[in-house]
Regions:
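Acidic/histidine-enriched, beta-strand-rich ligand/metal-binding domains
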Residues: 2-105
């Protein structure tokens, strides 16, 4: 099928394939990084952590009330100032920057 395409189109398709594979690798690394940060936060705080605001390095763990239970989220420097979307903040635990850096790939 590809043999009927022009060399330019074949080259473009190869580039797209490489970019797609690179993007998949980045997404996979981002997932791994999040899991590493969740584990670090759980070890440091003793809380089960399974939410993070984005792919940026977290600076704190914000614990908030949802009805009768508590939940938590890792927040980065950008989102820490936008905590208005979290209602009923119960506690904020700062994370040591050196610790976060040591758990960053």
């Amino acid at each position: 099928m590809l043999e009927h395409l022009s060399p330019e189109i074949r080259k473009t398709l190869r580039q797209i394939k490489k970019q797609t594979l690179a993007l998949q690798s980045i997404r996979h690394l981002n997932k791994i990084q999040k899991l590493i940060w969740f584990e670090m936060a759980m070890q440091v705080t003793g809380l089960d952590v399974n939410r993070i605001c984005c792919n940026n390095k977290p600076i704190n763990l914000t614990v908030y009330n949802i009805g009768d239970s508590k939940s938590s989220v890792l927040l980065c420097a950008n989102h820490v100032n936008q905590k208005y979307f979290l209602k009923d903040i119960f506690e904020v635990k700062l994370l040591d920057e050196k610790l976060v850096n040591s758990y960053t790939i």
